[in-house]
Each structure stands twice: as C-alpha cells, then as structure tokens.
Amino acid sequence: MAPKKAKRRAAAEGGSSSVFSMFDQTQIQEFKEAFTVIDQNRDGIIDKEDLRDTFAAMGRLNVKNEELDAMMKEASGPINFTVFLNMFGEKLKGADPEDVITGAFKVLDPEGKGTIKKKFLEELLTTQCDRFSQEEIKNMWAAFPPDVGGNVDYKNICYVITHGDAKDQE
C-alpha cells in the first residue's frame, strides 16, 4: 500500500464501531453495498473523485467542486465504511422513514420535479446492488406506471414503501 493511502486509511480508522449496533445485519449489508458503489476506485475510502465519478455514473456530469467539498466536509476525516455508517446513523436518528427514502430519491432528481425518468430508475434497479429481476421491474411498473413523458412519481413510491398503500392522487 502506498504511504499516502496508508496515512488516509489510518486516519479513517477513527470511526466508532458502536454504530454497528444501531442497524441490523441486513441494513449494514445494504449500507456496505451503497458504500461499494460510491467507492469507485475500490480503495476502501470515499474521496472527492469517488463522489464525482458516482455522480457521472448517474448522468450528472457538471457537479461543482464546491458541492463535492461540502459533501466531504460532512465527515471529520477520510470516509471509510465505519465513518460512512456513522454519518448515516447520525442523519437517520429520529428521521421519518418516508423523509429518508424521499431524500434518497431527491439525489436522483437534481431539478426537484418529484419525478425521475423510468429508463434511468430501471437501469439503476437492474444494474446496482440488490438487482431487480425483469419480473420485479414489470410488477413495479404495473404498480407505479410512468406518465406519458416516461417519468415516475417517486413520492408515491416512497409513500407506499412506508405506509403500504397507494396515496390518493390530489
């Protein structure tokens, strides 16, 4: 391991392992999968370039350095998996699950329209982490049909995930 990487990795070890008691094993595995997706260069540390590459993979090519710097400053040092888990633990304390899920979708909706493209969502769901089967995709589109423009209302999806039934259309 290069000295620079060793120094970064050693500095990242500062995260507390007690955060692992906040989540069950399934949740920890899901966070690990998300961490792995973001850690584009697979060095065990999320850095500014990993964030830039992750945004690029999602189609957002013009992320400003200031935005990336602000994200990196949310951590007190290098972001290894324990620090990543700690950050989510802090963010999720007392949070409404619907708000948390909606917040995750909002990352994919930089224009704040409340919708995301069907094609993009389908690509994410079939190529990242716990991949959807074609049958699961078909069932999802039956439950949450996109509009004529190919947009999916993610707020309705979030509501159903957290409440178990479709929200009445206003």
UniProtKB/Swiss-Prot annotation:
Record keyword Transferase present: no
Top-level taxon of origin: Eukaryota
Residue(s) carrying Phosphothreonine: 26, 36, 102
Residues that hold Ca(2+) according to the record: 39, 41, 43, 50
One annotated Gene Ontology cellular component of this protein: cytoplasm
InterPro entries noted in UniProt: EF-hand-dom_pair, EF_Hand_1_Ca_BS, EF_hand_dom, Myosin_RLC
UniProt keyword terms in alphabetical order: Calcium, Metal-binding, Methylation, Motor protein, Muscle protein, Myosin, Phosphoprotein, Repeat
Modified residues (N,N,N-trimethylalanine): 2
Domain EF-hand, chain residue ranges per copy: 26-61, 96-131, 132-167
GO terms (BP aspect): muscle contraction; skeletal muscle tissue development
This protein's record includes keyword Phosphoprotein: yes
GO molecular function per UniProt: calcium ion binding; structural constituent of muscle
More info: This chain binds calcium.
Subunit structure: Myosin is a hexamer of 2 heavy chains and 4 light chains.
General function of this protein: Plays a role in muscle contraction.
Name used for this protein in its record: Myosin regulatory light chain 2, skeletal muscle isoform
